[in-house]
């Protein structure tokens, strides 16, 4: 119990701390997000915090090959992609404060030391760093009933030690009934088909050595845990058997909440938190999620995703936005990966076979020629096209070159010496030296021209979407660009935000990233429009047909 001088737990939420063992990439974030979805359905206000134990202040300058996509929040925060999963599952907008990194913590502690806030004390990991971690978690949890806190990495990683120590202290400062430690661990099969518990036992042993005892164990496995395996885990890890849960592989991450519900994890958490009486009766809880993910699909379409990072996580939000649109349209979407650097290999065939084309954003010159070729194919063959950020900019470049005759037209980012810089640096970017957090970031409003495709998609004269860019359409070329069929149907002040083609069934580009605001229960309008155009244009094969389609996810 806390003393009078310690934190008052009555001011905060219930906390579920989620750690991972054995190996990274187990899906502890999806497990936590699924639990959060079910608690939200039960009528509780749920939020989430992702702890990333790296020294980067944020994810903004990290290589997508190493870390996956940089996810952008409304407030301009460039954060871990797991925050995207929390937003999609909880249908709540997060802030930069919901992503805690070692870099943020150390930066703040050092700045406070320099300003004399510590009054001459020796600044140490304990208590100064751990106190800052606890402060950040509690501030992010304000106003919620339940706060899910995911600790990135694996128990035992040296980078995560200060955070786990902070959680150990947290458990002593908080009432016992207000905190649960949930440990997600791997339960692999042996070669003879036996589920092995030893990795879990060793992982829990490591957690205990830090001073943390898990209250709940979730076994990630190919199939549900056998009863005798659950019993063995409970015995050797010192948790009740009814606190050992399975989280088996499923065909789609949006089915995980259904699995978690069947396992009873949400009910167990509510019981431990003494929240059952405050929860909505089961009959009154929303079934929207279940209805969506179990909805029958009546066809399938192939969408080519053109980008330069050969890693699915680098374009996670685009994949998910396509999935959300497919849930609304009632079709299966097969994503055909197209490496924009290999357009003239077998990838060119995928462009030709695709029912629709999405050209992703990115930075730098690598792969831009392939993206321009894909855009030209979409424009000339009336293939439904959606360009995002750089995809929007290159759609303007392609049109300038191949329709308006501006030979060599390009973005100044790619070719500083181009005769026709139809895409140029934002004016406010010229004097900046730092890369981190200096782009045009976050949610900005776009005015939409009535009577346009954009107006049809959004059903309004404005929209608010998230941005992440340094370059824009050069205002000096707008009159030339719009002289013959190209329309900028969305603007933010003097900035061009949306482009469309009057003589094309669906040629649509956005300077912003609509994928960041797409949710399973609220699909992004541009992605819905893309699939609608595909379905209008193509004969869609019945779901489960024997059509020979090459699919690369």
UniProtKB/Swiss-Prot annotation:
Pathway: Pyrimidine metabolism; CTP biosynthesis via de novo pathway; CTP from UDP: step 2/2. PROSITE patterns: GATASE_TYPE_1. CDD domains: CTPS_N (cd03113), GATase1_CTP_Synthase (cd01746). It is an enzyme of class 6 (ligase). The keyword Ligase applies. GO terms for molecular function: ATP binding; CTP synthase activity; glutaminase activity; identical protein binding; metal ion binding. ATP binds at residues 25-30, 82. Its EC number is 6.3.4.2. The active site is at 389 (nucleophile), 513, 515. Catalyzes the ATP-dependent amination of UTP to CTP with either L-glutamine or ammonia as the source of nitrogen. Regulates intracellular CTP levels through interactions with the four ribonucleotide triphosphates. This is CTP synthase. It comes from Halobacterium salinarum (strain ATCC 700922 / JCM 11081 / NRC-1). The gene is pyrG.
């Amino acid at each position: 119990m806390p003393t009078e001088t310690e934190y008052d737990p009555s001011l905060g939420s219930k906390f579920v701390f989620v750690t991972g063992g054995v190996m990274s990439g187990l899906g502890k974030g999806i497990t936590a997000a699924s639990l959060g979805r079910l608690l939200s359905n039960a009528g509780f206000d749920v939020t989430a915090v992702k702890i990333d134990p790296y020294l980067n202040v944020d994810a903004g300058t990290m290589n997508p090959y190493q870390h996956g996509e940089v996810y952008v929040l409304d407030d301009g925060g460039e954060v871990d992609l797991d925050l995207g999963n929390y937003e999609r599952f909880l249908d709540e907008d997060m802030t930069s404060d919901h992503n805690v990194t070692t870099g943020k913590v150390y930066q703040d502690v050092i700045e406070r030391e320099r300003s004399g806030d510590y009054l001459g004390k020796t600044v140490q990991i304990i208590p100064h760093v751990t106190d800052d971690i606890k402060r950040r978690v509690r501030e992010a949890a304000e106003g919620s009933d339940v706060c899910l806190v995911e600790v990135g990495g694996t128990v035992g990683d040296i980078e995560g030690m200060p955070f786990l120590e902070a959680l150990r202290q947290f458990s002593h400062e908080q009432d016992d009934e207000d905190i649960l430690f949930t440990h997600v661990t791997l339960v692999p099969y042996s070669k003879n088909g036996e589920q092995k518990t030893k990795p879990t036992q060793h992982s829990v042993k490591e957690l205990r050595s830090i001073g943390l005892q898990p209250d709940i164990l979730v076994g990630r496995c190919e199939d549900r845990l056998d009863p005798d395996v659950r019993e063995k885990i409970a015995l050797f890890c010192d948790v009740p058997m009814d606190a050992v849960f399975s989280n088996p592989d499923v065909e789609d991450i949006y089915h995980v909440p259904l699995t978690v519900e069947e396992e009873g994890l949400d009910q167990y958490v509510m019981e431990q938190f003494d929240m059952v009486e405050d929860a909505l009766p089961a009959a009154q809880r929303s079934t929207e999620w279940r209805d969506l993910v179990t909805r029958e699909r009546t066809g399938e379409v192939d969408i080519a995703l053109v980008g330069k990072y050969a890693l699915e996580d680098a374009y996670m939000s685009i994949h998910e936005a396509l999935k959300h649109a497919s849930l609304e349209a009632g079709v299966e979407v097969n994503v055909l990966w197209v490496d924009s650097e290999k357009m003239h290999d077998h990838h060119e065939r995928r462009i030709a076979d695709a029912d629709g084309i999405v050209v992703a954003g990115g930075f730098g010159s690598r792969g831009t020629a392939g993206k321009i070729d894909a855009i030209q194919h979409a424009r000339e063959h009336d293939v439904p096209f959606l360009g995002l950020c750089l995809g929007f900019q290159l759609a303007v470049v392609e049109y300038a070159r191949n329709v308006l005759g501006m030979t060599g037209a390009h973005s100044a980012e790619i070719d500083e010496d181009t005769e026709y810089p139809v895409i140029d640096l934002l004016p406010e970017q010229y004097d900046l030296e730092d890369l981190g957090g200096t782009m045009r970031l976050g949610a900005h409003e776009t005015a939409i021209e009535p009577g346009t495709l954009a107006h049809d998609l959004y059903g309004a004269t404005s929209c608010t979407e998230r941005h992440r860019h340094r370059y824009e359409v050069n205002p000096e070329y707008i009159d030339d660009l719009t002289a013959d069929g190209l329309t900028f149907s969305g603007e933010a002040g003097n900035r061009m935000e949306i482009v469309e083609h009057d003589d094309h069934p669906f040629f649509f580009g956005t300077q912003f990233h609509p994928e960041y605001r797409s949710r399973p229960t609220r699909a992004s309008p541009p992605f819905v429009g893309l699939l609608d155009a595909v379905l209008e244009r193509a004969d869609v094969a019945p779901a489960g047909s024997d059509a020979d389609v090459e699919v690369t996810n």
